[in-house]
């Protein structure tokens, strides 16, 4: 079937990119549980430049509320400790040799509600991005049909596919949000 250069898979890729971004943003929201991903944004001043923590140490979760950071180079322990303290994550490392232990404090009810609001904001921004992708796709289809590059039937069929992809992506966003909300509110 002629699609006049219209690629539904490209639209789906753009929509998936938005949900991947949401997953990353939601992963950065600190819940009461320890997760190695909490330290992904930490940059360490090392060897004359800023390096991601995961290039200098191994992060593990030995207990649900404890992170363990095993620094590979003994000379970098202080720099890693400073980077974690300066990261605004609210974590205070306890250093034992080349291992830093980070206790994850309990979240109070007010902070949990704030985090849920932030998660909702991220999800809404993702929904808006997905709708923009849908609008771009539908505009392209209208142009192609207007220029007689595709038939009206093809335009309607492809528009229906675009809507199906949008609905599926929005559903995925809602599921990601619900899971994160449950994780945040679980004491």
From Swiss-Prot:
Gene name linked to the record: frr
A matching Pfam family: RRF
The protein, known as: Ribosome-recycling factor
Similarity comment text for this entry: Belongs to the RRF family.
Function: Responsible for the release of ribosomes from messenger RNA at the termination of protein biosynthesis. May increase the efficiency of translation by recycling ribosomes from one round of translation to another.
GO terms, biological process: cytoplasmic translational termination
Keywords attached to this entry: Cytoplasm, Protein biosynthesis
Compartments, as annotated in UniProt: Cytoplasm
Highest taxon listed in the record's lineage: Bacteria
Alphabetized InterPro entries for the sequence: Ribosome_recyc_fac, Ribosome_recyc_fac_dom, RRF_sf
Organism encoding this protein: Rhodopseudomonas palustris (strain BisB18)
Gene Ontology, cellular component aspect: cytosol
GO molecular function: ribosomal large subunit binding
């Amino acid at each position: 079937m002629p699609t006049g250069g219209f690629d539904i898979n490209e639209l789906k890729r753009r929509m998936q990119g938005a949900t991947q971004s949401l997953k990353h943003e939601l992963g950065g929201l600190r819940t009461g549980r320890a997760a190695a991903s909490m330290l992904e944004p930490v940059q360490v001043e090392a060897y004359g430049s800023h390096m991601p923590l995961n290039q200098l140490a191994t992060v593990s979760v030995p207990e649900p509320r404890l992170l363990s950071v095993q620094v590979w180079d003994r000379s970098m322990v202080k720099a890693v400790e400073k980077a974690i303290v300066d990261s605004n994550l609210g974590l205070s490392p306890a250093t034992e040799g080349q291992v830093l232990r980070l206790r994850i404090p309990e979240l109070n009810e007010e902070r949990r509600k704030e985090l849920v609001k932030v998660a909702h904001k991220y999800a809404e921004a993702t929904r808006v991005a997905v709708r923009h992708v849908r609008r771009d796709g539908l505009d392209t289809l209208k142009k192609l049909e207007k220029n007689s590059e595709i038939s009206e039937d093809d335009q309607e069929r492809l528009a229906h596919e675009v809507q199906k992809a949008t609905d599926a992506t929005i559903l995925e966003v809602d599921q990601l949000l619900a899971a994160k909300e449950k994780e945040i509110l679980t004491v």
